[in-house]
């Protein structure tokens, strides 16, 4: 029969079992890079002073992993230029885009794991007519022609 001489003799075995659980690092959110044309801004953006929000817009992908697909993309505080975001989302959202205009071609870095990066309000005027499509969150937005 197995007997323990001291309670401390279990510590090395316990440490070996629990250590992998303690050091699991959170994996970075996977990203998707696409070139897409902004085809629909369904309404007016709320005022930034009211609350922090992400606003869903519709794009037609013209390059990258999802070529020729129509996608819905949430942008954090779209009234602001991407470089002017200065709150706690500055470390998440970037790019050189100054404003969102229908017809503009954008280079976007997206994540399909929106709730991992944004847990706040989402203004989604597509929700009533399209509940099935995935909503992507934009991490970086630039004009595709670099202007």
Predicted regions: what they are:
Residues 9-20:
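Bacterial N-terminal signal peptides
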Residues 7-10, 45, 84:
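Intrinsically disordered and other compositionally biased segments
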Residues 1-6:
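N-terminal secretory signal peptides that target proteins for export/translocation
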Residues 53-57, 62-146:
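Disulfide-stabilized netrin-like
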Residues 21-25:
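Sec/Tat signal peptide C-region and signal peptidase I cleavage site
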Residues 15, 26-28, 49:
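Generic marker of residues within folded, mature protein domains
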Residues 30-49, 55-58:
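Structural detector for short beta-strands of small beta-barrel domains
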């Amino acid at each position: 029969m197995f007997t323990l001489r001291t309670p401390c003799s279990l510590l090395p075995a316990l440490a070996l079992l629990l250590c992998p659980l303690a050091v699991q690092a959170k994996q970075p959110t996977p990203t998707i890079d696409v070139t897409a044309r902004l085809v629909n801004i369904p309404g007016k953006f709320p005022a930034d002073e009211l609350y922090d929000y992400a606003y869903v817009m519709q794009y037609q992908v013209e390059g990258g992993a999802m070529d020729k697909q129509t996608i819905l993309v949430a942008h954090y505080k779209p009234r602001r230029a991407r470089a002017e975001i200065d709150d706690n989302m500055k470390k998440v959202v970037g790019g050189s885009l100054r404003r969102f205009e229908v017809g503009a071609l954008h280079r976007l870095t997206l994540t399909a794991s929106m709730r991992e990066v944004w847990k706040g309000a989402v203004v989604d005027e597509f929700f009533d007519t399209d509940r099935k499509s995935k909503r992507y969150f934009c991490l970086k937005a630039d004009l595709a022609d670099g202007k």
